């Protein structure tokens, strides 16, 4: 199975479901095998290729050097495509405003639509010059 790790402006991302088991699960800080720094820019991210071994737990340290909100997440192509409408809804509801996130609107909408909270363990949504991290245990080699 091919696995994708995407940097995104606003689309696509992933829809969380049981299918997350296809690529792994949230990792434990005490089990991190390796740390990978991810630098996000407006049209690309570095490094542009990552090799991961089966059962490896990776801590991704992610920083947004771009001028827009960007998202880094781990998922299959199908998962990313499934999440596109949610990301568009965030734009339409003025939660994502180009270079910032309206966290108050995000919290309000998340009361009725939990996917809008963007608190998934395989994803970080970052404003410009902000950082985040993901710890992920992969169950397949990529």
Q: For each predicted feature, which ranges?
A:
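Extracellular/periplasmic metallocenter environments
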Residues: 18-24, 40, 44, 59, ...
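Beta-strand signatures of extracellular beta-sandwich domains
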Residues: 71-75
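Extracellular/luminal beta-rich ligand-recognition
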Residues: 85-103
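N-terminal edge beta-strand
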Residues: 26-58
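Sec-dependent N-terminal signal peptides
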Residues: 3-13
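Generic structural signal for beta-strand residues in well-ordered domains
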Residues: 10, 29-31, 65
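Short edge-strand/loop segments of extracellular domains
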Residues: 76-82
């Amino acid at each position: 199975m091919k696995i994708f790790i995407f940097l995104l402006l606003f689309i696509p991302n992933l829809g969380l479901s049981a299918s997350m088991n296809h690529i792994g699960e949230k990792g434990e800080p005490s089990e991190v095998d390796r740390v990978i720094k991810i630098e996000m820019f407006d049209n690309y991210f570095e490094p542009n290729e990552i090799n991961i071994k089966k059962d490896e737990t990776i801590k991704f340290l992610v920083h947004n050097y771009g001028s827009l909100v960007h998202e880094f997440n781990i998922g299959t192509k199908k998962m990313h495509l499934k999440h596109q409408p949610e990301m568009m809804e965030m734009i339409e509801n003025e939660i994502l405003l180009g270079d910032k996130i309206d966290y108050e609107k995000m919290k309000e909408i998340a009361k009725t639509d939990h996917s809008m909270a963007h608190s998934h363990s395989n994803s970080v949504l970052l404003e410009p010059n902000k950082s985040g991290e993901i710890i992920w245990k992969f169950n397949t080699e990529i």
